[in-house]
Amino acid sequence: MPVEIPADSVGLVTPQTVTFSAPLELECGRSLPGYTLTYETYGTLNAQRSNAILLCHALSGDHHAAGYHSMDDRKPGWWEHLLGPGKAMDTERFFFVCANFIGSCKGSTGPASTNPETGAPWGLDFPMVTVRDWVKTQAELADYLGIEQWAAVVGGSLGGMQVMQWSMDYPERLRHAVVIAAAPKLTAQNIAFNEVCRQAIMTDPEFYNGRYYAHNTKPRRGLSLARMIGHITYLSDNAMRTKFGRDTRGGKAFSFGFDVDFEVESYLRYQGSSFVERFDANSYLYITKALDYFDPASTWGGNLAEAFASTRANFLVISFSSDWRFSPERSREIVQALYTCNRDVSYAEIEAEHGHDSFLMPIPQYVAVLSTYLGRVAEEIGA
């Protein structure tokens, strides 16, 4: 918890909620009988309502992108390093909005929410949701906030996929699209990682076919394993070598057993056990499926340039050299497709050793690229 809030922080923030009562038609063919979104805002919306930027979060992220909910918080929001007064995403120039997407578990409607027809949690009766569905709800949130056009839509990882979907589905509603550490679709290997994670959850004896809420339990072992597997893919080999090497826990000798010997084992177990306390297992299943299904080019016979042909936004695409989950090669696919359809696109490959999680870190070159680009956006709109 902070002794005092840093001057360059957005400070104390309060989540807000909005409930939409009209049925939401989903890409899977089903619908939700209304839904709730939880979101946060940072900065001030100008009189012209032209300085709004939408932030799209990743798999385990949420609406809390920066600042603190109380002085008791152990740590600030997930993009604290980049979002705040005078930072790369400058709250003195822009008004930022970040919403928890449906299917998640941080306040927006998801599997743990109450099904109005049964009075019990949805569980696996919750309909499948997709990136396109998330973008649709974000557009409804923009309408609610009176924002006709975003100055930019920005997102990393799964958030970057939402940015791409925004540019295709609502081309007239964003001026700039910032796609960070993302891919135009998952590879077979990435789908395989997600499936192993899902199986870890679904084969846990405490899963109860997704109805573990009624049993006052949760699939702790399965969700913990899923997080451990996922976390390995977010880090590079060099990052793990630098952080852990083959160091034993506390420098002790081998136990010659199956308890924790190495620091990296201790780290992964901590990541797994702490994740269980803050995330819902069913949400993890739904979100990873949405990741798997994302493939906007499939509508166009696999031609990504055709998928981008209707876009109007200017693009900034950023990748990280050590990211093997969504490698620079995947970002270059996006850039090439945008070039092919004559879109304005800037590209930066950032040298970083942190792997996929680099998009969350204050790497100087990354900060400079983002700050310069958004600075030009601010000048363009007179912010």
Curated annotation (Swiss-Prot):
Catalytic activities: L-homoserine + succinyl-CoA = O-succinyl-L-homoserine + CoA
Give the highest taxon in the source lineage.
Bacteria
Primary location recorded for the protein, binned into one broad class? cytoplasm
Q: What is its EC number?
A: 2.3.1.46
AB hydrolase-1 domain: which residues? Answer: 51-360
Residues forming the catalytic site: S157 (nucleophile), D323, H356
Q: Subunit details for this protein?
A: Homodimer.
Described by its record, this protein's role is as follows: Transfers a succinyl group from succinyl-CoA to L-homoserine, forming succinyl-L-homoserine.
Q: What is this protein called?
A: Homoserine O-succinyltransferase
What species was this sequence derived from?
A: Acidithiobacillus ferrooxidans (strain ATCC 23270 / DSM 14882 / CIP 104768 / NCIMB 8455) (Ferrobacillus ferrooxidans (strain ATCC 23270))
